[in-house]
Curated annotation (Swiss-Prot):
Pfam families: Ribosomal_S19 (PF00203)
Domain of life where this protein originates: Eukaryota
Gene Ontology biological process: translation
Disulfide bonds: none
Gene Ontology MF annotations: RNA binding; structural constituent of ribosome
Name of this chain's protein: Small ribosomal subunit protein uS19m
Amino acid sequence: MVRSRWKGIYVAKELQNYNTVSNPTIVTTERSSVIIPYYLSKTIYVYNGRKYVGVKITEKSLGRKLGEYVLTKKVEKYKASKKVKKK
């Protein structure tokens, strides 16, 4: 479902009050926060459940959520089965 327009966009309080002058790295666990223009050309480290993954913010990513750029599940790679040669 889409968030109601009258509520506005959701940005975590820890991201709103972040001072990049004293601490240039932004670290958060809020995957549901919307990317706003204040974070343009900065790197935000988002927690995916195991480790923090860096997300570089560009103009194309404005208005989207941080969780869209951080995968939480490992991509499964299937190995090719070995064929047995008959003698």
